[in-house]
Amino acid sequence: MKPDAHHVKQFLLRLQDDICQTLSAVDGANFVEDSWRREAGGGGRSRVLRNGGIFEQAGVNFSHVHGDAMPASATAHRPELAGRSFEAMGVSLVVHPHNPYIPTSHANVRFFIAEKPGADPVWWFGGGFDLTPYYGFEEDAVHWHRTARDLCQPFGDDVYPRYKKWCDDYFFLKHRNEQRGVGGLFFDDLNTPDFDHCFDFMQAVGNGYTRAYLPIVERRKAMVWGERERNFQLYRRGRYVEFNLVWDRGTLFGLQTGGRTESILMSMPPLVRWEYDWQPEAGSPEAALSEFIQVRDWI
């Protein structure tokens, strides 16, 4: 089947609706929608839930941008895209809970297609989801990865280990020499064996996110926390900001190509702190995190 961008867009719009409705039902607060247009072509729907019962901030963004030509920064590494019109669309979300015992989660699914008359379209899917705990609970990481493995299984035995490793490699802070969290799935440039297969996989990842995350939220939301845990959460959120602004390709591409800044930076935590050369107390739960987020096989 030839690539069907309209079909993908309809799925992404439904996915945004479904995730927002599910998160609202769990939290009790509603998302506020901000629809926006891009002068050069396209637009999107940014939805944010703030100061809810469970989530300090949750942002779920849909975007669909298009144009007659790719920016030079995008074609430098992919010369086959030069001179083609393009469409890029996706859903991206980040959830920052109040409770430090609930991890932060991130998910993204996207589709890109570039076309010109007389030539086959160039297209691919990308996406994934990853988990960033502040306090490590093995059963949470195991559930997260088991859900990821199970949704990958129908697409081949090698899919989960391959995309799990890609996620571990991608969400790594080189300047800190540490992982961002316990990983999950990450894939990009997916265009084989055919459109239907790739689209099915992207849908499985998008639909799998809430199954992976919400049982963890339910398990941790009643845990009692205080100033110590909150300060550590804010300190560790600093790593999240550092990764997004220094290493994340999507953030950098969006900012460098004139994307909508408010939507791009919607992933940022609402509050964060840095402290010079801070070290956790030896033997403390805070000190245990650095070992917990080391790359390992969780299942």
UniProtKB/Swiss-Prot annotation:
Gene3D superfamilies: Coproporphyrinogen III oxidase, aerobic. GO terms for molecular function: coproporphyrinogen oxidase activity; metal ion binding; protein homodimerization activity. Substrate binds at S92, N108, V109, R110, G258, G259, R260. A divalent metal cation binds at H96, H106, H145, H175. It holds the Pfam family Coprogen_oxidas. Involved in the heme biosynthesis. Catalyzes the aerobic oxidative decarboxylation of propionate groups of rings A and B of coproporphyrinogen-III to yield the vinyl groups in protoporphyrinogen-IX. This is Oxygen-dependent coproporphyrinogen-III oxidase. The gene is hemF.
